[in-house]
């Protein structure tokens, strides 16, 4: 396993797909990183030289918020919405869909399992 930005990425995969194992980097961002670092997208991680890995790692560190920092930032954004009491914050607090989706027949995952009363002894 190669280590980029503190994350072990699989060596058998092509570089852009392997970079998506890092939280905050999708396939489009991974392609931009490969282009900026002049790394062939068809290369596998195992074929990269150490200086290529260092170049990719440095580019990510300088230009992107990833992993723990990104998770913390997202959590703080949600927390501020909840504290403001705005519509999106209320939806987060209640555990309902936030972006205007229908909830009458869908949103089972977001709403959770319905709790049916369990019949006791008579």
From Swiss-Prot:
Family: Belongs to the universal ribosomal protein uS13 family.
Taxonomic placement: Bacteria, Pseudomonadati, Pseudomonadota, Alphaproteobacteria, Rickettsiales
UniProt cross-references to Pfam families, sorted A to Z: Ribosomal_S13
Subunit composition and interactions: Part of the 30S ribosomal subunit. Forms a loose heterodimer with protein S19. Forms two bridges to the 50S subunit in the 70S ribosome.
Superkingdom assignment: Bacteria
A GO cellular component entry from the record: cytosol
Job description of the protein: Located at the top of the head of the 30S subunit, it contacts several helices of the 16S rRNA. In the 70S ribosome it contacts the 23S rRNA (bridge B1a) and protein L5 of the 50S subunit (bridge B1b), connecting the 2 subunits; these bridges are implicated in subunit movement. Contacts the tRNAs in the A and P-sites.
Keywords, ordered alphabetically: Ribonucleoprotein, Ribosomal protein, RNA-binding, rRNA-binding, tRNA-binding
Transmembrane segments: none
PROSITE patterns: RIBOSOMAL_S13_1 (PS00646), RIBOSOMAL_S13_2 (PS50159)
One Gene Ontology biological process: translation
Gene that produces this protein: rpsM
Protein species of origin: Wolbachia pipientis wMel
Name of protein: Small ribosomal subunit protein uS13
GO molecular function: rRNA binding; structural constituent of ribosome; tRNA binding
Region described as Disordered: spans on this chain: 97-122
SUPFAM superfamilies: S13-like H2TH domain
